[in-house]
């Protein structure tokens, strides 16, 4: 038998960083100015690292069974909760698509030299719908070109523009240009402090008068999600027990560095009132490139970022839904969802997925402010994902007691107490962030806070109830079939 090819600590760290890092979050963090350090620290040390460590133990324990989070939660509790976990992982990804497609729409708007389109809800909505269905059609064909596109997307569409914006910020400051961080309006009390002499200074810790002042925490947390996707590779390390924590801390350091430097670059160049959640990065490019009379580079950056965003959609469009296909083949979902085409692609699941994305993308069209729609979708996405993470932490703790003899090539250090500490900290951080998602951010013109909260609550409840309704319906159908067979 051929020897398995192991991966190195650095390779796993880079794989994890690639799954986590996205440029679309830079404007959101930049709006927090220097208080971004509080949010990034919270997301890195109370979410990213605990999720990676617990995910690694679960992934190494059930690597041979497959099914990911479905298997982890099913083994800890039951198949209904396992299905709920994989369903939430899938549906949050479905809700995520309109946010990244909205970001791609803004990229295209700047690429064609019409930045105003980035705030045109009709353009953003129709672009998101059209691009998603195009990506779905390509996925259904099973073309080999997809792998090449997605492998280059991170490097060309994320790393390169990220480095460019950081370098341009350094050049901007070295040239003696105004630093936007030093000219924040005194009305933004969450991120500035006014001393006795009425001088305005950026805060390092957010001024919190209510949950709305830290509502961006939920959206920032989402930027650090998906680390558990690569936790299953822990057994492929030569020494998982020592190498995996090092890989995760290295990935956390890379993510912390790129997110922090990139967001700082946006905050340094772009005036506070021009930082837009969806198109703030491109405003930064436009300001700095126009200043140095190379405005055409804004179009180039728009093209690169759009390529990276669309490549990201194509890389995820089939993957998470395969988890649902796996549960369908186990009889947890209706038989028609088991259908695959000649390329082995789960066609019916992707069609349903596309219909949901179309409906959610329509929010850009019907809502007055594109940024509010963008953040609303982000809040709904992170709320669903955080519930799945709570289930994952609970599964990790419970399995230490229900299956203590289970072979784990990687274990969270410190015995059961260590698992309680890591899993408990992660669970509490996620629970707090989940509560925050229901509060509208004070930094955005949401109009009616009650309407915003109502939309998030209803959307979360609808998607949370769906796996239970499906499980109940499938159990009733099986019961009816069993009774019918007995007659």
Residue ranges and their predicted role:
Residues 37-38, 118-123, 152-302:
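Helix-loop-helix junctions that connect adjacent transmembrane segments
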Residues 71-72, 78, 110-115, 188-203, ...:
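TM-loop-TM module centered on a large, flexible mid-protein loop between adjacent transmembrane helices
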Residues 3, 135, 152, 337-343, ...:
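C-terminal membrane-solvent junction of multi-pass transporters and transport-like membrane proteins
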Residues 1-56, 64-66, 184-185, 405, ...:
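Membrane-interface "cap" regions at the ends of multi-pass membrane proteins
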Residues 4-13, 94, 122-129, 238-242, ...:
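Loop-to-transmembrane helix boundary motifs in multi-pass membrane proteins
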Residues 31, 49-140, 306-326, 370-383, ...:
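Hydrophobic transmembrane alpha-helices that form the core helical bundles
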